[in-house]
Amino acid sequence: NIPGCNRLAYFGTSSFDAGVVAARLLSDRIAPEADILVGSIIHRGDGGSNQCRCREMGFRDYLGRAGFRGRLLGASLRLDDEGYNRRVLDELFEENPRIAGAVTFNSTCYILANYLRSSGHDGVRLVGYDVIRRNREMLEAGVVTALVAQRPAAQGFHGVMALCDMLVSGRRGPSDNLMPIDIVFRENVRFYNSHII
């Protein structure tokens, strides 16, 4: 949801609140003084998306209100450079042995999950976003603790329907249409079908 873009309609989650949900999921599973790794996995360029920034704001806001006393440790990782990522993360974990949680704010938490699994950091709780195939595999394997999901097929369906209503009948519906924030665990992922509208 990008303010000021003259959109017909937005169908999706509140990114800020999705960040709050991730913080709650993670902070309920680690000690208040434990450190959290914030993995920024760069797809292109050097900045994250508006959605990722809003998720991180919600995450930080919740931790600030919840009595979190640990540190948030950032790591900028690369989408297609496993060697670089390993060097960055090895150094970060060596210098910060109190890391007990990790989060990514885009759909590529499997990159961080691969590192955690291969480097023996089994105790780190990882929360990510979106039930894409590789994230789902890591969730089913128990490497990812939880995924925050947003029903992309339903978003697309409702968006196309809003466009059809506008083009066919001239009706313009509400511009902001917030959808549920789904929490997916290893135990319920087999029931999660994002294509059900």
Please place each PLM-identified region on the residue numbering:
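Short beta-strand segments enriched in small/hydrophobic residues
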Residues: 8-9, 35-47
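Flexible loop/hinge segments that line or gate small-molecule binding clefts
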Residues: 1-17, 132-140
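Hydrophobic alpha-helical
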Residues: 74-134
